[in-house]
From Swiss-Prot:
Protein name: Protein translocase subunit SecY
Family: Belongs to the SecY/SEC61-alpha family.
Membrane topology category: Multi-pass membrane protein
InterPro entries, alphabetized: SecY, SecY/SEC61-alpha, SecY_CS, SecY_dom_sf
Gene label: secY
HAMAP family (alphabetical): SecY
Cited PANTHER family: SECY/SEC61-ALPHA FAMILY MEMBER
Role: The central subunit of the protein translocation channel SecYEG. Consists of two halves formed by TMs 1-5 and 6-10. These two domains form a lateral gate at the front which open onto the bilayer between TMs 2 and 7, and are clamped together by SecE at the back. The channel is closed by both a pore ring composed of hydrophobic SecY resides and a short helix (helix 2A) on the extracellular side of the membrane which forms a plug. The plug probably moves laterally to allow the channel to open. The ring and the pore may move independently.
Amino acid sequence: MQAKPTTAVKQKQNFGQRLFTLLRNRDFMISFLITVVLLVLFRVLAIIPLPGIQVNQTGLDQNSNDFFSLFNLLGGGGLNQLSLFAVGISPYISAQIVMQLLSTDLIPPLSKLVNSGEVGRRKIEMITRIITLPFALVQSFAVIQIATNSGGGSSPITLKNNGSDFVAFYIIAMTAGTYLSVFLGDTISKKGIGNGITLLILSGILAQLPEGFIAAYSVLSGVVVTINATLTTAISFFIYFMAFVTLLFATTFITQETRKIPIQQSGQGLVTESSALPYLPIKVNSAGVIPVIFASSIMSIPVTIAQFQPQTESRWFVEDYLSLSKPTGIVLYGILVILFSFFYSYIQINPERLAKNFEKSGRFIPGIRPGKDTEKHIARVLVRINFIGAPFLTVIAIIPYIVSALIHLPNSLSLGGTGIIIIVTAVVEFMSALRSAATATNYQQLRRNLAIEVQKTAQQDKEEQLRAETPGIGNLW
């Protein structure tokens, strides 16, 4: 009779109790250790330069451009030292984005693979890894060229032997590092905790945060002579830090907001309360971080190419109007983020595919006819949500550059919206994985306790039956 209250208490565990329960779970601890060991291995290999490479004291952070910084962010932070993971996961992410775009109605065979279940998903993944190879080769070559030639300034990287054989070796090594990083990410996803690819990128961003704050304070301080200069530096750094914290909280809030479209199964009967119906969740920021990556890439490529050109009028135009440190560049960047948000969210949600799947499975939206009407309704809801999500994503993307311009920081030290969104997304996914593991552990304990109770009850029943039969056996004698 006292077992029921104990079970009820276990179901209402707080976070500390759940964490303690997880730490006592052997399977969870093995998965946790696998995750930690692989992340540490990734970070160690990311900070060791390749043989024959000398990183100058100025480092890559001070000399890097926007294109360089984006590679470093998506690659996992190995670009700073030109390590084995210099390009890291960036080519794989580029290949994934291309496959997502091509898997729409652009290429019908790929669209069929997407709808072919687990077999189709495996084939899509195999094609993605094949496409990763040319991306890795091109990005590795671009990284070496940018790192060893800063457009006429001091080069942040020195190759002790810049012969074609050594350059080919570096390209092959970085390409191999891409596939090794993908392998580490897949291993974490399968045997560890959370999404491995996201955690690898997160580890690189978090590893650079302290260094970034220190570098920002150093740039802001300059040569401190008077008390007023010290106070001005402190105020500027406080604005810089508070902008980072504010964007983190705002991004967390908008990332978790969803618009719920109620759905119903045909033949289920009439349900009067919409709260009792299952629903289709559409996130306010359904496009995720992809629009920011697209916009950053498009804006940074012309500026990067211009750095290798002589001082001409075209180079002056690009650097003066397309750079993210200029007002025109920031405005154009914001427009691109909005356009890509509408475009990519439509690809992600795909109202046409959803409407067809609803019709095949016998589901429908109450008050909306199946088929084209359902597709139009979902598309209409998506457009309305994007009128909120796209401007908000744009604000997150451009505020770091505005703050950097106000307090006179280089773009390489700006708190990019891409990194902030990745941090929030990765942490939310990881916490969700922990909650799922805690729930699974709790259910396992409940099942074990129930099995023990059933075994005890069966043993007691058996003993009572034997005691009941014992007098009868005694009477036979």
